[in-house]
Amino acid sequence: MLPDAIAEQPTKLPVIGYLAFASPGLAPTTAVFLGGLGETGYVEGQNVAIEYRWAEGRYDRLPALAADLARPGGNLTGVSLLTLELMAKRLELLSELVPQASVVAQLVNPNTSTTERMIRDVQEAARVKGVQVHIVKAGSESEIDATLASLAQLQARGLLVSRDPLFNSRREQLVALAARHAVPAIYPWGEFAAAGGLISYGPSLTAALRQVGIYAGKILKGAKPADLPVEQATKLELVVNLKTAKALGLTIPQSILARADEVIE
């Protein structure tokens, strides 16, 4: 009887911990991660289990959620989304789009560890271009409205939105506020432009999450995280929303349209 009893016991599946800042409804790209995982032969519920933890847009929930998923030991690897490297390039694009904008604002989250370096990089690029950059901060959903309302007082003619999970999860709110205050804004993800944002420039989030899924599958197959180099996102996308440009009374330069990966009309 013992062999039969053993045979009847379900096989214990390996488990992946999936921690996201957003809520499930705001994270459709999870399917892209699962697709990348599937490329390595793993299918959720069949030969791998996934423990999801959602911060619901709240930074204060992340430490407890991460601790809930923590396992002893191990190393780190992953995909870099070029958070810092692209801010200066976005300033160049904004200046090309609105050449008369001698004063712009940079929206940052003061609770993010990379914020100070992002500010330094943008300020250095602004000095070279002769542009004044005001730093405006929002560390929670409730602060976003008041922060964008302050742009008129600062006489900012453009807005740089930094890459941050909070801003990504509130992209519809940010896009609507930029439209309300008639401020040309450049965003870090194509999802912002799809939501009505004027222009976005940054790595493809779907391509990055696909690679994360592939890495997760490789680790499940026995690869050591330390042996998997942290990859930099190589697919950068420039997305322009002509409908929003028209609403703002802007003409997108041909030099930008010619380089755009996607033009939303």
Q: Would you name each region that the model predicts?
A:
Residues M1-E265:
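Short hydrophobic alpha-helices and adjacent helix-cap/hinge residues
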